């Protein structure tokens, strides 16, 4: 294994419930049942990739080496899934807000879903524009059901590659080998969101300077292998396992050497999500 030093996506070094849903599609007819998102609109949807690599000097944040590899890999992966990919590089917090607002005001009525990937520095609840932090909730709120009507009842995925704190995970040895019939149905405005975080709350998120982040590497690999076979939550579970078992940090600083990472999925999806139909 090459000794490429591993970095973290933080500003500087200085009660979730889950549920299991069974069944999804009719294997005989291929028709969607009520527990599976309708993904056969004319378009799969937009995939916005915000790739922040270089930051203003007054922020004190370092350049995120390896992130361009992630952005290219993500673009290829989601284009192969028939998404319209829009790449945005080195955006300030104001530019990110403007971008998200404008995208939320587009007509998504012919689109099956929406994806936003953010590659940046971060902390718990915030991600960084090139000139400073912004609350993630402010960005995602533009796509709530009461603000973005054309995405109501459709899956909205936010994939976040960023630190969520400064805790380190040393690991432990183990012995063990839309279509809602909306005419008369009311749904929560926060429904149908999914947040795929690169790391658990409070922890660093690791990134290899040449190969990109562990999480994005694993996500793209699992999507390429399973997007036409498995439901999305099952894919993300495989991503979790791959990151947890196949990666360990390498650093010349003993404090940051041989550390582990586990991604975190927060789902408000109300149906199963398949990228095929």
From Swiss-Prot:
The active site is at 121, 163. GO terms for cellular component: cytoplasm; death-inducing signaling complex. Its main location: cytoplasm. Its EC number is 3.4.22.56. One of its GO terms (molecular function) is endopeptidase activity. Inhibited by BIRC6; following inhibition of BIRC6-caspase binding by DIABLO/SMAC, BIRC6 is subjected to caspase cleavage, leading to an increase in active caspases. Residues 1-9, 10-28 form a propeptide. Belongs to the peptidase C14A family. This is Caspase-3.
């Amino acid at each position: 294994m090459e000794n490429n030093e591993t970095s973290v996506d933080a500003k500087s070094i200085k009660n979730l419930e889950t549920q299991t849903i069974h069944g999804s599609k009719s294997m005989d007819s291929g028709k969607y049942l009520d527990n599976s998102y309708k993904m056969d609109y004319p378009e799969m949807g937009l995939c916005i990739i915000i790739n922040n690599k270089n930051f203003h000097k007054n922020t004190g944040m370092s350049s995120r080496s390896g992130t361009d590899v992630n952005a290219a890999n993500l673009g290829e992966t989601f284009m192969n899934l028939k998404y319209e990919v829009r790449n945005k590089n080195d955006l300030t917090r104001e530019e990110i807000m403007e971008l998200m607002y404008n995208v939320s005001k587009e007509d998504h009525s012919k689109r099956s879903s929406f994806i936003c990937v953010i590659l940046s520095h971060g902390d718990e609840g915030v991600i960084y524009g090139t000139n400073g932090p912004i609350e993630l909730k402010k960005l995602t709120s533009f796509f709530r059901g009461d603000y973005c009507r054309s995405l109501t009842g459709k899956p909205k995925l936010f994939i976040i590659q960023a630190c969520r704190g400064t805790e380190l995970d040393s690991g432990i040895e183990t012995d063990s080998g839309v279509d809602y019939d909306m005419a008369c149905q009311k749904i929560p405005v926060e429904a149908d969101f999914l947040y795929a975080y690169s790391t658990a709350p409070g922890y660093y998120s690791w990134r290899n300077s040449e190969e990109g982040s562990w999480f994005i590497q694993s996500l793209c690999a699992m999507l390429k292998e399973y997007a036409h076979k498995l439901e999305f939550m099952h894919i993300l579970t495989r991503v979790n396992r791959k990151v947890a078992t196949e990666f360990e940090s390498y650093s010349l600083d003993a404090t940051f050497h041989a550390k582990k990472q586990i991604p975190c999925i927060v789902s408000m999806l109300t149906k199963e999500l398949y990228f095929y139909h």
